[in-house]
């Protein structure tokens, strides 16, 4: 009986990974080949060289997009979202988030909370700050919308 259950569980996980959907467990580091959803806990979700769509959901998540065009959602909780290289879309969500678009022309939206945005990469980024007191570290070419504090020195994550 145990072997049958283990076989079924292994096959189910393999099918989910082949379909490009990976499930993260609380406190577990998870590599997401294409699309990935976190849990209600604190997740560490990592993209690959493929374009990724990663959703942290609840919890204080660490999300890394890596290469190419990634779409990253922090969700509820104080998240750290890193776009990596490529033209990324990064969304902080609710909570006090740290959002770094990475290298490339990025779209960054913080959501509610007192957020910190890092966009000093030499590319023109579009940055939309939400409710709360947001600090953004930018280049002169970045375009800001509703951001409370603009800084040009390097942020400390």
Stretch-by-stretch model annotation:
Residues 118-157:
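Leucine-rich solenoid repeat scaffolds
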Residues 9-17:
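Bacterial N-terminal signal peptides
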Residues 1-4:
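Positively charged n-region of N-terminal signal peptides that target proteins for export
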Residues 24-69:
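N-terminal segments that cap or nucleate solenoid repeat domains
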Residues 25-26, 40-41, 98, 107, ...:
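Alpha-helical transmembrane bundles and membrane-interface segments of multipass inner-membrane proteins
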Residues 37-38, 47, 56, 64-65, ...:
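Glycine-centered beta-turn/loop sites at beta-strand termini
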